[in-house]
Amino acid sequence: SHGKQETDEEFDANL
């Protein structure tokens, strides 16, 4: 996961 605002526990929506 490349969390920008979210953490790495989030999904890869912030690619």
UniProtKB/Swiss-Prot annotation:
Q: How does it sit in the membrane?
A: Peripheral membrane protein
Gene Ontology CC entries for this record: mitochondrial inner membrane; mitochondrion
On subunit structure and binding partners, the annotation says:
Component of the cytochrome c oxidase (complex IV, CIV), a multisubunit enzyme composed of 14 subunits. The complex is composed of a catalytic core of 3 subunits MT-CO1, MT-CO2 and MT-CO3, encoded in the mitochondrial DNA, and 11 supernumerary subunits COX4I, COX5A, COX5B, COX6A, COX6B, COX6C, COX7A, COX7B, COX7C, COX8 and NDUFA4, which are encoded in the nuclear genome.
Question: Quick one: which pathway?
Answer: Energy metabolism; oxidative phosphorylation
Q: What function is annotated for this protein?
A: Component of the cytochrome c oxidase, the last enzyme in the mitochondrial electron transport chain which drives oxidative phosphorylation. The respiratory chain contains 3 multisubunit complexes succinate dehydrogenase (complex II, CII), ubiquinol-cytochrome c oxidoreductase (cytochrome b-c1 complex, complex III, CIII) and cytochrome c oxidase (complex IV, CIV), that cooperate to transfer electrons derived from NADH and succinate to molecular oxygen, creating an electrochemical gradient over the inner membrane that drives transmembrane transport and the ATP synthase.
What are the TM regions of this chain, as residue ranges?
none
Say if the entry is tagged with keyword Membrane.
yes
Q: Name one GO biological process term.
A: oxidative phosphorylation
What family does this chain come from, according to its entry?
A: Belongs to the cytochrome c oxidase subunit 5A family.
Could you name the domain of life of the organism this protein comes from?
Answer: Eukaryota
Q: Does the keyword DNA repair apply?
A: no
Q: Where in the cell is it found?
A: Mitochondrion inner membrane
Q: What is its main location?
A: mitochondrion
Recorded protein name is: Cytochrome c oxidase subunit 5A, mitochondrial
Disulphide linkage map: none
GO molecular function terms noted in the UniProt entry:
metal ion binding
Keywords for this protein:
Heme, Iron, Membrane, Metal-binding, Mitochondrion, Mitochondrion inner membrane
